[in-house]
Amino acid sequence: MDALFIPQDHPARTMQDTFYLSSPESIKIDEERLMQWAGTHQDGRGTTSRGWGGVFDAKESERALLRTHTTVNTVKHIANNPAVPSRVFGVGRVFRQETIDRTHLPEFHQIEGIIHEEQASLPMLITTLRTFYSKMGYSDVRVRPAYFPYTEPSIEVEVLWKGAWLELGGAGIFRPEVTQPLGTEWPVCAWGMGLERLAMLILGLDDIRELYQPDLAILSKMPIL
């Protein structure tokens, strides 16, 4: 989370929102990377940002947890390929302390994508997202301003579903506080969305929990995506 410029006191990092592990309780982080993130958080080190200020706690950084975003893979890829143009797409399981309801699950799959190249831009990102959702069968797509600690500008993507707008994912351009410590000067278009929520819409379900219920009679009628 430090690599994504999420403040160490952000609500998303509390026990109420994240599954922390008891074994192992901590994971060793590369000292050089840790110092870069510490400087960025404290005073924006090398960027135009002033950072978050305050004290940076290395022990907080090393706390082991179940990933809340597949963006951890994105960060690793950019760090390993800072000067290589790339377009990366992936699907992975994530875990969050969510209250279970018709559109939320504590364990689900996230779709993640990035465009990492010198000419990457917000119009390119929006066009990519509109194309993606239109190929999924959603012609009514809208983009709204949003806020995420790790992107600026930030947007949310919504599709029209049963007469109402349903938020499917967040996106934006990674902030310099994220990209510069990873060694790249190029902009990075990034987006993520929930696979189960998208599947719910495609299958015409009213409740996301139906995707995991054990009724064989219902499951036998579901198409294989």
Mark where each language-model region is:
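TRNA-recognition modules of translation machinery and tRNA-sensing kinases, especially anticodon-binding
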Residues: M1-L225
